[in-house]
């Protein structure tokens, strides 16, 4: 069970604030897209990432095997335009690149198994950069959606009202992030969640990617 001393905020500096965050205390969760996605009330815009990476091949029940190889796959996302329209628009336009910059060619720079995948730093690639379509930072829109399950899309930040382009995808429920990070979308389907699990297997408890080819967004856009 998580208590107040285990609260950690996902920062855009590439490190967790609290040194007491322990992988042994993270909740274990099973994931069923059919159950989770059917309960979603805000089905709006859809976008995608096409990714390439090196890492373990998944076996039964999406568990990593000892076989390591170059892989590729797609993650489809559904955005909550009706709940957080400004945040959803930012992510969508960074996917399309219509403003002359965006996620294409960037990588997931920080992955912690049984926690999350963090990406979106397309200027520096290490968790210290990125920018929004509105300028450098924009305010937290609201915290209506909670981090209640795997497969949720949420904004990484450097504190209140410091949203840019960095985001994370949960791989377990992360309720200690509620009220601190804006949830603005979700992984759209089971096949996409399999890709999330494959990317999760490339990470480590420190967040460092364990293989030479980081998970890279080779293409992205709107569906």
Swiss-Prot record:
Keywords: Cytoplasm, Isomerase, Mitochondrion, Rotamase, Transit peptide
Transit peptide location on this chain: 1-44
Superkingdom field: Eukaryota
Entry annotated with the keyword Transcription: no
Presence of keyword Lipid metabolism: no
Membrane-traversing stretches: none
Positions of the PPIase cyclophilin-type domain: 62-222
Any Pfam family the entry gives: Pro_isomerase
Activity regulation text: Binds cyclosporin A (CsA). CsA mediates some of its effects via an inhibitory action on PPIase.
One Gene Ontology term from the biological process aspect of the record: protein folding
Catalytic activity: [protein]-peptidylproline (omega=180) = [protein]-peptidylproline (omega=0)
Alphabetized InterPro entries for the sequence: Cyclophilin-like_dom_sf, Cyclophilin-type_PPIase_CS, Cyclophilin-type_PPIase_dom
Example GO molecular function: cyclosporin A binding
GO cellular component: cytoplasm; mitochondrion
Cell location: Mitochondrion; Cytoplasm
Similarity-based family: Belongs to the cyclophilin-type PPIase family.
Protein name listed in UniProt: Peptidyl-prolyl cis-trans isomerase, mitochondrial
Organism whose genome encodes this protein: Neurospora crassa (strain ATCC 24698 / 74-OR23-1A / CBS 708.71 / DSM 1257 / FGSC 987)
